[in-house]
């Protein structure tokens, strides 16, 4: 009996986490709308971001082509709790944190070698069809810049 209760409790807890993650406005695949975005001339092309459930965390995968035509892919898995989690494949950051502001808004910070390299805000529209990312950062050459990237839900 105790085993059944524990099993049921674990199952319900897992389902609750899955429902919360699935209900998150950021979840899904987002494609960059270059025409609506204000990006650095050296910014990404053919850029896609996917948010997917990964247990009780979220996995964010970024894929695309840079301005020189080189393809890239980065991954981050963590929680929207303001704590830093490792990033792979990102030239600007090796750690990133996301903090939930409300149901449709996140703030993020990326660091490289312990120094902040990028900060920004992610906002999903009320209808859930558009995602806008405003970011300020410093690249490897020390150049500072601000961008606004608009994404369409796929």
Regions found by a protein language model. Name each.
Residues 1-12:
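Bacterial N-terminal signal peptides that target proteins for export
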Residues 13-22:
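Hydrophobic h-region of N-terminal signal peptides that target proteins for export
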Residues 22-154:
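Hydrophobic small-molecule pocket/channel-lining residues, especially in calycin-type beta-barrels
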